[in-house]
Amino acid sequence: MNLTLPMKKQKFLLIISLLILLSLLHQDYHIEAQNSDKVVNLPEQPLNPKISHFSGYVNVNQENTRSLFFWFFEALSESPSTRPLVLWLNGGPGCSSIGYGAASELGPFRVVENGTSLSFNQYSWVQEANMLFLESPVGVGFSYTNSSSDLENLNDAFVAEDAYNFMVAWFARYPQYKSRDFFIAGESYAGHYSPQLAELIYDRNKVQPKDSFINLKGFIVGNPLTDDEYDNKGILEYAWSHAVISDHLYDSAKHNCDFKSSNWSEPCNVAMNTVFTKYKEIDIYNIYAPKCISNSSSGASYLGFGVNDKSPAVKDWFKRVRWFEGYDPCYSNYAEEYFNRVDVRLSLHATTRNVARWKVCNDSILQTYHFTVSSMLPTYSKLIKAGLKIWVYSGDADGRVPVIGSRYCVEALGISVKSEWRSWFHNHQVGGRITEYEGGLTFVTVRGAGHLVPLNKPEEALALFRSFLNGQELPSSP
């Protein structure tokens, strides 16, 4: 009697059974993990519309127990299962994507004054996409590490690697989003974070196993720090052209500063320090908006850019020029009140042990951050050639990362113009200007918006975002 065939069949059936069992266990893990992340009974959450959201930690380094905190919102679209996934990053370095992006700008909930309640944001970007807000780098917001050396070694490469590891692990936890079109979005110093993460994903996709593949389609950045030379040149020219500084100060800075060099002369430092002191009476992030008057000990106290009126501290300019690119100080006060409530932290599954007090911006991150990359233009060139869709938008009332510098950066790429500079419209009014370039790059201005475009011009920001995602032209007529 030949028992060979039945034995082979038994082994085959055993293997199939084990694979099915492993698949079921894996599926159970996903369901259990997502259920544990689900946010229920968030204090002060509006009852309508019904919004499904999740929050928690993803470990990106087992050795140092380095964990990044996220807040994820499913799209409010009629078909959320078909909508893309968008990762949002705020800058600083050191500012929270939850305090700004999620709770003050484009998330579905906005913190109301004094952090006592939430209001529904009808112009939230969750109208168009599944939005994932990440507190990065480690040390920002609720994200934490058990190793102090992590905080001493932060630089752009470190941050990009952690963000990449986060996304790989997050997709393993939420596999239903793995095949979606994936975009990265952000503002300010995310002008570094976003393209660097995009580049890392692009490079890793070519060599990593299939289960680590990320379906990256492009990125969109607002008022982004891009190139030190052009950004700093733009700061000076914007301040002069918008009557913030005198002709004499402008001429002095222009004469003494070589913006191509990272080692500025003392006369240049003195001149540029003076430029920033002229902004102390107004809001540099939105020069036409009323200045928030607050005695809070939150991020609002940093608006002086570290300038000591009795001692210019010229040697500290390089840190000061990078001071938190992007916040409304009053909104940051409200966010700090809300996210330090014990009931809120418990609802969001945020640790109270590793993070004693949540801050909208962590100044120690800025002080220890190693600025090793002066220009993102080579990365832009690489990713444009790779075929990624890239949009740069700029609120034209921002004095910190002004539209002038961003225009210099885009022009320096040397890409042929596909569609000439024109106006775009929203609600029968000019929303801003737009230029399209060959290769998928688009530059858009938003009229009357400051550094935080979704906060200052929420309707226009949503229209712009919708156009970016859907590949639709912004209206060229009222």
Swiss-Prot record:
Gene3D superfamilies hit by this protein: 3.40.50.11320, 6.10.250.940, alpha/beta hydrolase
Molecular functions (GO terms): serine-type carboxypeptidase activity
Record: active site: 188, 398, 451
Species in which this protein is naturally found: Arabidopsis thaliana (Mouse-ear cress)
Organs and tissues of expression: Expressed in senescent leaves and flowers.
A biological process from GO: proteolysis
EC number(s) per entry: 3.4.16.-
Pfam family, one: Peptidase_S10
Record keywords: Carboxypeptidase, Disulfide bond, Glycoprotein, Hydrolase, Protease, Secreted, Signal
Gene: SCPL33
Designated name of the protein: Serine carboxypeptidase-like 33
Signal sequence, start to end: 1-33
Disulfide bonding pattern of the chain: 95-361, 257-268, 292-330
